[in-house]
Amino acid sequence: MDWKDVLRRRLASPNTDPKRKKSEQELKDEEMDLFTKYYSEWKGGRKNTNEFYKTIPRFYYRLPAEDEVLLQKLREESRAVFLQRKSRELLDNEELQNLWFLLDKHQIPPMIGEEAMINYENFLKVGEKAGPKCKQFFTAKVFAKLLHTDSYGRISIMQFFNYVMRKVWLHQTRIGLSLYDVAGQGYLRESDLENYILELIPTLPQLDGLEKSFYSFYVCTAVRKFFFFLDPLRTGKIKIQDILACSFLDDLLELRDEELSKESQETNWFSAPSALRVYGQYLNLDKDHNGMLSKEELSRYGTATMTNVFLDRVFQECLTYDGEMDYKTYLDFVLALENRKEPAALQYIFKLLDIENKGYLNVFSLNYFFRAIQELMKIHGQDPVSFQDVKDEIFDMVKPKDPLKISLQDLINSNQGDTVTTILIDLNGFWTYENREALVANDNENSADLDDT
């Protein structure tokens, strides 16, 4: 045999010599090949061991990674097509007008006041004539839900039509919010909700007077209310269902009304006067004009009678930057103090009062905060009130399950959480509570004087 042929065959098959020691990389490759082979055989062998595997629906869908551009585009397009289809299934204005015409045509006398009524038989007739889009509304369940005490077994046409309108609005709003749900998981992140509200501003006549430079502050003010109350665990996202279920979106969309009263605007957190008020307070507190609030600056909030002990806890527990509070953190603080009856606000304040992080307030916690109230009373020339008396009053008001501990749930259940927290953190609030009987008597005297005049 020609030595050239032998050498050529040897170079072409370097691993044929059984005496040759394999390299570390070759051993790893061989091990991986064997693992892949045996794993595939094992997996294939187990695939059909349980027939139920075929009927269990898939419940996990992996989201495309950032580098999977095609999958992301496919997901976005499919969601857009799905939402467009859902939108087309909703009643438009013309179809709603036609529905109202059919309901009015099939009303059954006598009317109740000015309310037109319809019985179940005609209700079903209207459902047949109204078209397939309306079929979901013309069910026995809906009729029974709206049936009250009418002796003829009828329902109010107006109530039914309002029900349909509300359902259509909810579905429209859900579709609108879902367009901003980037992940497609049924919730909105803070940035998603910010984009939604920012694009909503031009459609709200009551916000026409806002300068564009203020838009970012307005959006921050609006979004914080949603997240403060609907995201108590601070996960950074809110379910779209929760947004629809609460009244905040109604309050926001109320600003579409060009003739909204001044009183309604003042009580609506999302109105321009309210947003400007909150931001104006922040600017007034910011004496050094650095865009942040120090503890000393925040101490002038409201009546400037909050205790230093409470303010210390605010800056210990809340997110700060070099010991100063930004506007977003300030908004949480304001929402908590202005809504002390709400569970989310009580949760915020309770965390500050729970200095030992035990999940409850004991006599030590109450005394720790009330001593600061007593010190302020001395500074203002008032006689300090006995802590023992105040402690007994607090436990009497709350009536906790454990007679020595007050939990957050105890505060919420008692409906006295706002009073208890005010007593412990604000001298003016404590003074108002302590003199409540005199203040009530004074109000009665003033009202009597007005009646006499």
UniProtKB/Swiss-Prot annotation:
One GO cellular component term noted in the UniProt record for this chain: cytosol
Record keywords, A-Z: Calcium, Cytoplasm, Metal-binding, Nucleus, Repeat
Keyword Hydrolase: no
Gene3D superfamilies, per database record: 1.10.238.220, EF-hand
PROSITE patterns noted in UniProt: EF_HAND_1 (PS00018)
Phenotype on disruption: Mice display a reduction in the number of mature B-cells and an impaired B-cell proliferation upon B-Cell receptor cross-linking probably due to a loss of inhibition of BCR-induced apoptosis. PPP2R3C overexpression protects B-cells from activation-induced cell death.
One Pfam family it belongs to: EF-hand_13
Domain EF-hand: 273-308, 341-376
GO biological process: B cell homeostasis; positive regulation of B cell differentiation; regulation of antimicrobial humoral response; regulation of B cell activation; regulation of dephosphorylation; regulation of mitochondrial depolarization; spleen development; T cell homeostasis
Presence of the UniProt keyword Cytoplasm in the record: yes
Ligand binding (Ca(2+)): D286, D288, N290, M292, E297
Cellular location(s): Nucleus; Cytoplasm
Superkingdom of the source species: Eukaryota
UniProt GO MF annotations: metal ion binding
Tissue specificity: Expressed in all tissues tested including heart, brain, spleen, thymus, lung, liver, kidney and testis.
Induction: Up-regulated upon B-cell receptor cross-linking.
Biological function: May regulate MCM3AP phosphorylation through phosphatase recruitment. May act as a negative regulator of ABCB1 expression and function through the dephosphorylation of ABCB1 by TFPI2/PPP2R3C complex. May play a role in the activation-induced cell death of B-cells.
Subunit structure: Interacts with MCM3AP/GANP, PPP5C, and the phosphatase 2A core enzyme composed of the PPP2CA catalytic subunit and the constant regulatory subunit PPP2R1A. Finds in a complex with ABCB1, TFPI2 and PPP2R3C; leading to the dephosphorylation of ABCB1.
Entry-linked PANTHER family: SERINE/THREONINE-PROTEIN PHOSPHATASE 2A REGULATORY SUBUNIT B'' SUBUNIT GAMMA, SERINE_THREONINE-PROTEIN PHOSPHATASE 2A REGULATORY SUBUNIT B'' SUBUNIT GAMMA
Protein name, as recorded: Serine/threonine-protein phosphatase 2A regulatory subunit B'' subunit gamma
